[in-house]
């Protein structure tokens, strides 16, 4: 008969305490309901404005499309608010990109440049991932992801996260063979399969 190891390999933990969510006035707004409220021209403008403001609490990836749709709305107030929200999110990332570029340019060696180079690849990816750029700017951002990811991977080839970003970038650019290579390498370097 086979030998069974009877040692306990699992640790016991205390169950977490459940806390009721705080009563948030925007908690009931979901992207589907917001889109419905904004697209219904018969909804009073104050309700449509509340729906638009509820998007501030949603991730940019989910709300950018709704905000872009609102840019063609008949109400000037809604259009201006949607534009301001999109512009604010894009400016936050652009400011972080400028900071990382300044740090990148000040450092003389590839070893020292690794951290800002990786950060630049991630930040340009965020512009694309959050749907904050379109058209030529999206294409430019994907090129910058490729440039900085490749540069960072030359110094630290075992960076699983960068390989995954590279795979996603190649997928969006339509090069599925390179994308598969990026994902395969990311998994080999320890990137979790569930992400």
Label each residue range with its predicted role.
Residues 1-21:
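N-terminal alpha-helical membrane-insertion module
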Residues 76, 80-83, 87, 91, ...:
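Amphipathic alpha-helical repeat scaffolds of TPR domains
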Residues 14-26, 47-58, 69, 80-91, ...:
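Structural detector for internal amphipathic alpha-helices that build alpha-solenoid repeat scaffolds
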Residues 42, 111, 154-158, 188-191:
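Short coil turns that delineate tetratricopeptide repeat
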Residues 46, 115, 161, 178, ...:
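Start-of-helix register in tetratricopeptide repeats
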Residues 28-38, 60-71, 94-102, 163-164, ...:
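Amphipathic alpha-helical scaffolding segments comprising HEAT/armadillo-like alpha-solenoid repeats
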